[in-house]
Amino acid sequence: AVFKFRERDPKVIPRQVRGNAILELAWTLIPAVILTFIAFPTVAAIFRTQAVPVKDALRVKVVGHQWWWEFQYPDLGITTASDLHLPAGRPVTLEIASTDVIHSFWVPQLGGKRDAIPGSVTRITLTADTPGEYYGQCAEFCGTSHANMRHLAVVQTPEAFAAWAAVQKEPALAPPDGSPAAAGLQVYRTSTCVGCHTVRGVSGGGIGPDLTHLGSRKTIAGGILRNTPENLARWVRHAPAVKPGSLMPEQQLSDPEVTALVAYLQSLR
C-alpha cells in the first residue's frame, strides 16, 4: 500500500471512484430485512418473559450483595444463598433487586439476564424444563470480586423440590451433646459469626448469608467453592484470601476451633 499509493506527479489526477449504488443498497437493505425479521420474535419473547405469569408461578426474590446472591421464597418462608432451587416444569417469577451496587442476574442456560438495581425491582419469568445444575454469573461489573459472584441454579423434579422446601422451612437442629458439631455450636456462639449471620433458633444477624441449612447447599462463598469440609475451612479461616474484598473478616480461631465450627456448619442440613 505504501508503494502503490506513494506521492506521484501532482498533475496526474487519479481515477475517481464514485461508489456503487447497487452494492451500497444491497449491503444496507439485506441486513435491514434480516434484522427486521429477527426483531419481531425477539421483542415478543422479551415481553413474554416480563409478563405476569400464570397464577401457580413460584415467586423468588433474588437479592444481589457484594459478592453473593440471596434467594427468598416469600410464599414458602425460605431464605437461602448461593444455590437457587427451582421445580422443573413450573413457571417461576424472579423479582430481582440489590442492596448495594448494580449487579446483573444471569443463568445462560435458563434465560436472559436482568439488572439488579438498588431501590428498584426488575422481573423475569422462566420455566426450567430439565432437572440439573446450571451455573450463573453476575453479568455487570460490581467491584473487586465481580468475577467471583456466581451461583448455582438447581432444577429439581417437583417431588424433590417439595422435599427440599419442607426441610428448608424448619429451624436448625441442635447437634447431639458431646459431638464435634456441639463443640462447633459453642464456637459459633462465641465468635463474630453471630453478628452477621442467621441460624434460625441460634442467631439473627442480617449482614451475611443465612446459614440455617448451610450443610445442604452444594456451593459456598457466593458460589465459587463446592461445599466440602476442606473448602469451608478455607473460607472460615480467611475469606478475603479466597474472595478479595469479602466483608467477612479473617477469623482468629485455632485449628481445633475451625474443625469444630466446620463440623457444626456441615451439620446444618
Task: Show the residue positions of the predicted features.
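Active-site segment flanking the S-adenosylmethionine/decSAM binding pocket
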Residues: 264
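Non-transmembrane, membrane-proximal soluble domains of secreted or membrane proteins
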Residues: 1-194, 199-206, 223-237, 242-244, ...
